A protein has these predicted regions:
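Extracellular/periplasm-exposed beta-strand and loop segments of Gram-negative cell-envelope proteins
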Residues: 31-43, 75-105, 137-173, 204-221
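Acidic/histidine-enriched, beta-strand-rich ligand/metal-binding domains
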Residues: 73, 77, 104-105, 116-127, ...
């Protein structure tokens, strides 16, 4: 019976108390899942901000942490305006191929579980991040080379265009994010990371009731990022 406390202690893993902070930056590739469908290419945009991570435990070979970030992110969509023959749609007024894209800026706040395997404080480890993410709308900007009233509707294979004149209606975004990455730690120099992350939006940017035009309008975002962290408590 006297051995039970020692067995229990071994089962819960080795406690950690490491707090790391730093910065991150990268590039977003985003589409919006519109229903009815809007044909798009991925829209690029900046992503970057601040990272905080608290390492709580090492359980066997798994290093367990919680990680939070506050990031500025450019999302949106870029329309692929084509004919039924997959050719660019030429505007009758301007004589050039029609182009339209929308940039929507957010402050994004992910809260994630961070699980890593490998070297903890010197060398490389591989990690996964996963958890909820919340987005707070800052503003939006449209880039277009044609007037909406003068768009070439006759030649478009995809006739859905209501989104071109609609501002974002729902200013709070939320969803699930997950990523895979690698970290390299150098004592007294810091921790260097590279990560690929995916965000699936569960909220819509437009109303989605039966009376609304779009049934869905949620984000899907691939992010490639790098980060630098340093320990302030160990």
């Amino acid at each position: 019976m006297m051995t039970l406390p020692f067995v229990a202690k071994g089962q819960i893993g080795d406690h950690r108390n490491t707090l790391s902070i730093g910065v991150n930056g990268g590039y977003n590739l985003t589409t919006v899942r519109f229903t009815p469908k809007v044909v798009q290419n991925m829209k690029g945009g900046f992503a970057g901000g601040f990272t905080m991570r608290y390492t709580v435990e090492k359980y066997f070979s798994t290093i367990a942490s919680v990680q939070g970030e506050v990031n500025f992110a450019q999302l949106g969509w870029k329309e692929d305006i084509r004919t039924i023959d997959n050719q660019p749609v030429i505007n009758a007024i301007t004589g050039v191929a029609e182009k339209y894209e929308r940039t929507i800026n957010y402050v994004q706040v992910p809260f994630m579980a961070h699980l890593a395997w490998g070297r903890e404080n010197k060398g490389a480890n591989f990690f996964v991040n996963a958890g909820p993410q919340f987005g707070f709308y800052l503003g939006e900007k449209t880039s277009s080379n044609f007037e909406f009233a003068n768009r070439n509707t006759a030649d478009r294979a995809n006739s859905v265009a209501a989104q071109d004149t609609m501002s974002v209606q729902k200013k709070f975004d939320y969803g699930i994010t997950a990523g895979l990455g690698m970290e390299y730690a150098i004592p007294r120099a810091g921790r260097f990371q590279v990560e690929a992350r995916y965000y699936y939006g569960l909220g819509n940017i437009y109303g989605d009731s039966k009376k609304d035009y779009f049934g869905s309008s949620n984000f899907g975002t691939i992010t490639i990022k790098i980060a630098y962290l340093f320990d302030i408590m160990h």
